């Protein structure tokens, strides 16, 4: 037998009055005896705190404060502790003989709230020899000890081998450990469970009948049937899920068209835009390529035009240059003509001026003679005037000498003055400022020598002058002629120059005679040279146009070659026209074929899409229509096989469901009629009695009872006889066994157990041999095991059935798809690929276009070559007649030679014309130049100069002679003052002086008159000279101008200049005509270039815009493609058949779909916003986002338990396959899941009956309990009338209320609540929902009413109420109820705890003095019978006979309180035996 766990001791550390006290607890009753305030309640509070460390529940009050809500005077738990670390520990030993110490560490928290900190812990594996006080205290000396903190306690225990210390952060974990180790009777999972446990302990502690427990006895005594509730909840959850699934199916069925519509329109909306963008991208690429080709072609054309323009511009520049040259030549020729004409006029003027000059020359010579005579007369007058002047001077001198003679002093003064005057005059004339009277003699000799030299030179010059006077006139005439011809020169060079000029004049006359023949020869050669230059220009132009230089010898052969080429090119051009027509015809045929293929391509693509879908669905490749028809036959055969297998699996699944339903019957009855018969007979099914048989014992009992394992056990068979008469609604074999259902055993049979079998001796002559069944069904455990295996098998079968059903419907749909394909697409599906042929034709078309382009280029080149050949022939026709001129290389040299000779002859003619007369005059007198006399004028000047020098020297010598002669007079300085007076001589001299002065005046007047006449002669001479010089200068200017003109003014010069001018005018006109043609062609070319440039610029702009658009679209398209590929929707969007629609058709298709989508997503805010964002034409990726959002939305709407795919399109296809099958299966499942109302009533009744039997068993244990007048205590359990009526209606009249239970809108709980309201309309349900009420009605405890009754004296059985009982009777009754609750908890928790553990039982009773001795004895008997421990507190007058008693006395020692404890074990006549460890331990700590 399993021993019950016990509490060994209670240890208090640092409590109020208890420093370190351990109370050993008795196995039955431990009594705490002592006066008021001795510490009994503190000890019990420490026990309760260690048992339930929940501060929200702990509330300690004295019994004298009954009804009070506030704490006691010692402040509850806070007041029972001392400062510092406190402990309360329980030392227990469980059924496994494991010592477990559980407890709490308590510590007061400072503050006004007076809180307490609690930390629960547990110690396992502690040796028996170690006392709890040794763990938590440390002895300091003999009189002092210290309480260890929790961390030190932990370290101390971890150091001990085999000891485990656990600290708990939650009370739930703490109680869980206590429950698992058998310390408490019930698992306290929640705060509600802890509250019930605390209320139980509190009721036990304070005694009496607790209203909190009696009001909720059902919660304390009746276990919660969680299995039944969970079964109902699972059933309802399954039904709810089933119904939700059915509703989802119905919603899906209703949404299927919406799904189809949404997917179809979304696909049309996005795919049309997707394909439109793809088409536009291809079109843009084609346009970009076309623009690039056109751009390349235009650039080539522009380059050709530019080359042409450059050529024409170069030719135009040449013509412009030539025109400038021609204009210059023409202007030069015109100017030359004008110059010739001017020269002729100038020559006439020159001849006229030369005649005038000859006349002026004669007049000038005559006037020179008149002037010479006037000059001679002028010289005579000057001599006479000079003589008169000298006479006046002489007279003045004589007048001065005469005065000197008048008086010596005067004379000396005069002499002195004259000497000074002579000295000053000598200084001035001799230019000797330092001259003195003393040095005058020396200077006189010098100046006399100079006078002599000057006189000799003057005489020599006078002789020379007389000799040169005769030759001067002829030499001057010849010299002037030489100067006129040659220009200024030295006189000594005149003879040589004159001879050279005469010889040159002869040569120049000979050259001048050759001018006319040379001019005619030059004109002829210049004409030939111009023709040669024109031929060279034509040849150079021809070579430039041909791009090659040709020799003159090659031109005739080239002319023939070009004519042959012209003929050949003419044939090629005609042949090219025919070839071009053939190519264009083939191109048109290709275009027509491509159009027909493009019309057929969408039909073929649709057939291929359908064929690909069929191939994907069936995993086969079809190459011909025969493959399709053969596979269709295979599909039909497979469909038949799948239907047969599905039906077989469905039959097996139904059989399993039936077996599960049969085994799931309550009580283990496989026949519902047995339950009704058992209730009718007042018996119990045998299977229900053995419902708790373990799985190991089930085969034995199943074989033991054999066919009678479904028997009904009745108390009395005789009472059943009357019910058997007329009984028809029963199994074929009905077994009835007489026995007490509460104490039934298997002793009714004589059994011999064999190996896996039994032999049952039914009678002496009848045995039954039964083998143990392989699958036993006897007992709940066996049935549950079987049901579990059946459920597993059913899951496999259901999955297989679902798979087969899906395969069947999939096969059927595949058959329908094949049928549609055969009817619609079989005719075109296996034809050749039109797109491949289109690609081939397009490549051929590109080749044809390239060939046409090349052909056009070749033809253009041939035309250009043809035109070039024609131009070359034309040019050669102009060049060939002039080949002889081109071959004449010396023509230019001869022209230059003749031109040089002509220039020389013309120069000679101009020389003869200009200087011929002067040479003729010079020739007879040239000999006078041989002896060139000195220059007459120079000689005259030298003579006059020598005269002046001789005169000056004579005057200087005279002045110095006078100074020398008057050297003595310088000493008469004193006599200068003595001069005065006049004399008569002086007067006479004065008169003569006046006459001389008059004569001088007349001479001067005559000189002045003759000078005026000379001036007139000179003026006439000057006028003639001026006229002659002017004429001479004009003549020189005219000759110089004629020389500057540089033309020969002969008689034929004007005619030649006019002919030359006319020729150049003709060339200039031709050049201007060609230039105008070139300018027009150049203007046209420039216009063409401008057009090409504008076109090129437009093409470049269009190309770059298109390229930028392509690049931009490419980036967006890449994002679109990336998004498409990432989301796997390319197959849905890339619909190739749409590629053949126009952009307008696709845009119209997209717009129509957009309108439909706006209506479809009007109620979906997310899709509506995404759709609105997708309407931006610049953001095509947003349409993909919308398509993905639609797919995601549809994926979220897809029930994955119905349709196993993420693709909404496939989901719709699978949906149609699954919906009908699931609807049928779920409807059947709902019927099977839905438990019948009768079954519910039977389950509740059976549960109520079982609990009533259990309460009856509990009552048997309280029959002998008596307290005072109370003789017995019992629990009365009754079914409430309203609930009993509900059970009757559920079992008997459920057909009348099927509207509730068959409603798909109500769960079973709600239907049950509605039925309860319908049966009890007078009851107010308040604010509770039907679901809540229904769940309460599924709990059997709500069907029962429980009350405690006591058998008191003569009153009999009365309801136990505190007012009807004495205090002791109430305490005893309450304790009886608590014992019943604890026992009920143990029974309830037995299946949750290990089978080898029996939990501790312990209750409290404070203030037990209110019980009499008989009641105390009753408690002791109750504790002994129930193996329960009891801690009671009583005053000192209580003396229990059994158990352990502790005497507690509170003492005060040196202001310190401590409790003195003495422990006694039992009462007897002998002296009480002192328990070990009863001595008072010191209560003080250091």
Curated annotation (Swiss-Prot):
It comes from the Bacteria. Residues 326-418, 444-480, 509-603, 835-923, 977-1115, 1209-1266 form a coiled coil. GO terms for cellular component: cytoplasm; nucleoid. GO terms for molecular function: ATP binding; DNA binding. Residues 666-783 are annotated as: Flexible hinge. Homodimerization via its hinge domain. Binds to DNA via its C-terminal region. Interacts, and probably forms a ternary complex, with MukE and MukF via its C-terminal region. The complex formation is stimulated by calcium or magnesium. Interacts with tubulin-related protein FtsZ. The hinge domain, which separates the large intramolecular coiled coil regions, allows the homodimerization, forming a V-shaped homodimer. Plays a central role in chromosome condensation, segregation and cell cycle progression. Functions as a homodimer, which is essential for chromosome partition. Involved in negative DNA supercoiling in vivo, and by this means organize and compact chromosomes. May achieve or facilitate chromosome segregation by condensation DNA from both sides of a centrally located replisome during cell division. Belongs to the SMC family. MukB subfamily. This is Chromosome partition protein MukB. It comes from Escherichia coli O157:H7. The gene is mukB.
């Amino acid at each position: 037998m399993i021993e019950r766990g016990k509490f060994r001791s209670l240890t208090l550390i640092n409590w109020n009055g208890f420093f370190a006290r351990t109370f050993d607890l008795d196995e039955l009753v431990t009594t705490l005896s002592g006066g008021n305030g001795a510490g009994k309640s503190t000890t019990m509070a420490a026990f309760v705190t260690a048992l339930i460390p929940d501060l929200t529940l702990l509330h300690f009050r004295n019994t004298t404060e009954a009804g009070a809500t506030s704490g006691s005077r010692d402040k509850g738990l806070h007041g029972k502790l001392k400062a510092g670390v406190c402990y309360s520990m329980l030392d227990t030993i469980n059924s496994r003989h494991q010592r477990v110490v559980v407890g709490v560490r308590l510590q007061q928290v400072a503050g006004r709230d007076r809180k307490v900190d609690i930390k629960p812990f547990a110690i396992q594996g502690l040796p028996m020899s170690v006392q709890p006080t040794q763990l938590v205290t440390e002895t300091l000396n003999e009189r002092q000890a210290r309480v260890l903190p929790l961390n030190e306690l932990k370290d101390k225990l971890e150091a001990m081998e085999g000891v485990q210390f656990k600290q708990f952060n939650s009370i739930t974990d703490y109680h869980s450990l206590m429950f698992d180790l058998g310390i408490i009777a019930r698992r306290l999972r929640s705060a509600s469970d802890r509250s019930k446990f605390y209320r139980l302990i509190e009721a036990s502690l304070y005694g009496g009948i607790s209203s909190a427990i009696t009001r909720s006895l059902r919660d304390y005594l009746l276990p919660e049937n969680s299995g039944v509730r969970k079964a109902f909840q699972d059933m309802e959850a399954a039904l709810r899920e089933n119904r939700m699934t059915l509703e989802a199916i119905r919603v899906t069925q209703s949404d299927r068209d919406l799904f189809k519509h949404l997917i179809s329109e979304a696909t049309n909306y996005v795919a049309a835009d997707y394909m439109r963008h793809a088409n536009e991208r291809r079109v843009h690429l084609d346009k970009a390529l076309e623009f690039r080709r056109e751009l390349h072609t235009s650039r080539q054309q522009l380059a050709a035009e530019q080359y042409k323009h450059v050529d024409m511009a170069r030719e135009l520049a040449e013509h412009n240059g030539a025109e400038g040259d021609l204009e210059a030549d023409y202007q030069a020729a015109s100017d030359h003509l004008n110059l010739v004409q001017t020269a002729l006029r100038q020559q006439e003027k020159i001849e006229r001026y030369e005649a005038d000059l000859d006349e002026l020359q004669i007049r000038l010579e005559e006037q020179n003679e008149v002037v010479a005579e006037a000059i001679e007369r002028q010289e005579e007058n000057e001599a006479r005037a000079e003589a008169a002047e000298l006479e006046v001077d002489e007279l003045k001198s004589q007048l001065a000498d005469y005065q000197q003679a008048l008086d010596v002093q005067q004379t000396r003064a005069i002499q002195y003055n004259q000497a000074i005057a002579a000295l000053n005059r000598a200084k001035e004339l001799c230019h000797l400022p330092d001259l003195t009277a003393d040095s005058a003699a020396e200077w006189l000799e010098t100046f006399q020598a100079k006078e002599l030299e000057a006189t000799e030179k003057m005489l020599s010059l006078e002789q020379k002058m007389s000799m040169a006077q005769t030759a001067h006139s002829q030499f001057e005439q010849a010299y002037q002629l030489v100067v006129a011809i040659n220009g200024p020169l030295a006189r000594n060079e005149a003879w040589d120059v004159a001879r050279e000029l005469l010889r040159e004049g002869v040569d120049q006359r000979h050259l001048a005679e050759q001018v006319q023949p040379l001019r005619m020869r030059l004109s002829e050669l210049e004409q030939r040279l111009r023709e040669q230059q024109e031929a060279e220009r034509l040849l150079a132009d021809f070579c430039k146009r041909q791009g090659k230089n040709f020799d003159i010898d090659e031109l005739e052969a080239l002319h023939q070659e070009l004519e042959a080429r012209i003929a050949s090119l003419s044939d090629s051009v005609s042949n090219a026209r025919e070839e071009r027509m053939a190519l264009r015809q083939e191109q048109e045929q290709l275009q027509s074929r491509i159009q027909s293929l493009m019309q057929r391509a969408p039909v073929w693509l649709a057939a291929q899409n359908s064929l690909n879908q069929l191939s994907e669905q069936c995993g086969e490749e079809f190459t011909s229509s025969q493959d399709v028809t053969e596979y269709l036959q295979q599909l039909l055969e497979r469909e038949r096989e799948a239907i047969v297998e599905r039906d077989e699996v469905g039959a097996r699944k139904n059989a399993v469901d039936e077996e599960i339903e049969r085994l799931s019957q309550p009580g283990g009855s496989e026949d519902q009629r047995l339950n009704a018969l058992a209730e009718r007979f007042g018996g119990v099914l045998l299977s229900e009695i053995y419902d708790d048989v373990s799985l190991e014992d089930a085969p034995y009992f199943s074989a033991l009872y054999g066919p009678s394992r479904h028997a009904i056990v009745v108390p009395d068979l005789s009472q059943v006889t009357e019910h058997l008469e007329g009984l028809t609604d029963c199994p074929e074999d009905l077994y009835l066994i007489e026995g007490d259902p509460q104490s039934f055993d298997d002793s009714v049979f004589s059994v011999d157990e064999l190996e896996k079998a039994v032999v049952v001796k039914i009678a002496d002559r009848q045995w039954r041999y039964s083998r143990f069944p392989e699958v036993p069904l006897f007992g709940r455990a066996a049935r549950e095991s079987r049901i579990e295996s059946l459920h597993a098998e059913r899951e496999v079968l259901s999955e297989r059935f679902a798979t087969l059903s899906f395969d069947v419907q999939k096969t059927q749909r595949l058959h329908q798809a094949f049928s549609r394909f055969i009817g619609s697409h079989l005719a075109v599906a296996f034809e050749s690929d039109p797109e491949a042929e289109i690609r081939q034709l397009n490549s051929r078309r590109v080749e044809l276009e390239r060939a046409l382009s090349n052909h056009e280029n070749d033809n253009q080149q041939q035309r250009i070559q043809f035109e070039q050949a024609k131009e070359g022939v034309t040019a050669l026709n102009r060049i060939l007649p002039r080949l002889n001129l081109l071959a004449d290389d010396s023509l230019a040299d001869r022209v230059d030679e003749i031109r040089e000779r002509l220039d020389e002859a013309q120069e000679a003619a101009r020389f003869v014309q200009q200087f011929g007369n002067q040479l003729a005059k010079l020739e007879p007198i040239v000999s006078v130049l041989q002896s060139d006399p000195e220059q007459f004028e120079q000689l005259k000047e030298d003579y006059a100069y020598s005269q002046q020098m001789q005169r000056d020297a004579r005057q200087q010598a005279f002045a110095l002679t006078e100074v020398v002669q008057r050297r003595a007079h310088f000493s008469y300085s004193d006599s200068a003052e003595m001069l005065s007076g006049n004399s008569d001589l002086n007067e006479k001299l004065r008169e003569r002086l006046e006459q001389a002065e008059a004569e001088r005046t007349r001479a001067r007047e005559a000189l002045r008159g003759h000078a005026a006449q000379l001036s007139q002669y000179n003026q006439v001479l000057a006028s003639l000279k001026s006229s002659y010089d002017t004429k001479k200068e004009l003549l020189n200017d005219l000759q110089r101008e004629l020389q500057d003109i540089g033309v020969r003014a002969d008689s034929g010069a004007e005619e030649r200049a006019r002919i030359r001018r006319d020729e150049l005018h003709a060339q200039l006109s031709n050049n201007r005509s060609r230039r105008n043609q070139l300018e027009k062609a150049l203007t046209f070319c420039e216009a063409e270039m401008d057009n090409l440039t504008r076109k090129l610029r437009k093409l470049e702009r269009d190309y770059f815009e298109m390229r930028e658009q392509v690049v931009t679209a490419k980036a967006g398209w890449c994002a679109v493609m990336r998004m498409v590929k990432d989301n796997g929707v390319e197959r849905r969007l890339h619909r190739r058949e749409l590629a053949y629609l126009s952009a307008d058709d696709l845009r119209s298709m997209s717009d129509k779909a957009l309108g439909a989508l706006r209506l479809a997503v009007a109620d979906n805010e997310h899709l509506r916003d995404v759709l609105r964002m997708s309407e931006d034409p610049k953001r095509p990726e947003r349409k993909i986002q919308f398509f993905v959002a639609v797919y995601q939305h549809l994926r979220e709407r897809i029930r994955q338990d119905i349709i196993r795919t993420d693709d909404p399109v496939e989901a719709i296809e699978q949906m149609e396959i699954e919906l009908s099958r699931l609807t049928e299966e779920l409807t059947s499942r709902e019927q099977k899941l839905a438990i019948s109302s009768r079954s519910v009533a039977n389950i509740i009744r059976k549960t109520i009956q079982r609990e009533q039997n259990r309460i009856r068993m509990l009552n048997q244990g309280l029959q002998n309990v008596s307290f005072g007048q109370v003789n017995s205590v019992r629990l009365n359990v009754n079914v409430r009338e309203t609930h009993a009526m509900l059970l009757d209606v559920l079992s008997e009249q459920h057909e009348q209320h099927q509207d509730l239970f068959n409603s798909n809108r109500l769960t079973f709980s709600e239907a049950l609540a509605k039925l309860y309201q319908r049966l009890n309309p007078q009851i107010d349900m308040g604010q509770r929902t039907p679901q809540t009420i229904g769940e309460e009605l599924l709990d059997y405890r709500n069907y029962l009413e429980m009350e405690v009754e006591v058998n008191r004296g003569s009153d009999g059985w009365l309801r136990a109420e505190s007012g009807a009982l004495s205090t002791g009777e109430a305490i005893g009754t309450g304790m009886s109820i608590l014992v019943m609750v604890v026992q009920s908890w143990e029974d309830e928790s037995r299946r949750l705890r290990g089978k080898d553990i029996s939990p501790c039982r312990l209750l409290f009773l404070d203030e037990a003095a209110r019980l009499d001795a008989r009641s105390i004895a009753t408690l002791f008997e109750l504790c002994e019978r129930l193996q329960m421990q009891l801690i009671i507190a009583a005053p000192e007058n209580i003396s229990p006979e059994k158990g352990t008693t502790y005497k507690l006395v509170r003492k005060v020692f040196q202001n310190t309180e401590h409790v003195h404890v003495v422990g006694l074990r039992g009462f007897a006549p002998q002296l009480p035996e002192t328990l070990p460890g009863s001595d008072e331990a010191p209560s003080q700590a250091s």
